[in-house]
């Protein structure tokens, strides 16, 4: 059997908005508002990029931009990589013995981005711009 990828993205749906000849669409996570388009993880959360902050941008395509700021300074675009979503990996690691189907588990996803902060106590802001020009922002304060 093939392993079934577990991804936060599975808990949502696409929303399409039509205005005359213009079409806008976005991913809607169940239980979250429209602006919740990505998850941001602190340094150390990702087993693939332990030295980096990681963003999982669920509906990403090549027209999107993923920028980051450290202490208010524009650091440019984050680097895309393939890896495990930290929350899904941790969930599977802790709970796999209780799964009814043993082929369920964390799988590699290709909509992850990373950036390595210069200092351990930085304020990090990530700005994601989608294909329609909508900007989504998340902030976190790194701890020492």
Positions of predicted regions on the chain:
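Short, small-residue-biased leader/transition segments that mark boundaries at the very start
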Residues: 3-8
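Short, compositionally biased P/S/T/A/G/V-rich stretches that sit at domain boundaries
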Residues: 12-14, 19-51
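Active-site-proximal beta-strand elements of phosphoester/diester hydrolases
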Residues: 1-2, 27
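Long, low-complexity serine/threonine/glycine- and acidic-rich segments characteristic of extracellular
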Residues: 40-54, 58, 62-144
């Amino acid at each position: 059997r093939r392993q079934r990828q577990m991804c936060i993205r599975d808990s949502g749906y696409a929303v399409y908005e039509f205005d005359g000849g213009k079409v806008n669409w976005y991913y809607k996570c169940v239980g979250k508002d429209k602006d919740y388009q990505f998850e941001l993880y602190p340094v150390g959360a990702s087993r693939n990029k332990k030295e980096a902050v990681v963003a999982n941008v669920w509906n990403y395509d090549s027209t999107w931009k993923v920028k980051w700021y450290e202490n208010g300074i524009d650091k440019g675009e984050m680097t895309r990589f393939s890896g495990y979503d930290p929350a899904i990996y941790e969930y599977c690691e802790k709970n796999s013995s209780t799964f009814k189907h043993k082929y369920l588990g964390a799988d590699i996803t290709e909509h992850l981005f990373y950036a390595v902060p210069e200092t351990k106590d930085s304020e990090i802001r990530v700005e994601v711009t989608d294909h329609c020009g909508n900007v989504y922002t998340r902030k976190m304060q790194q701890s020492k």
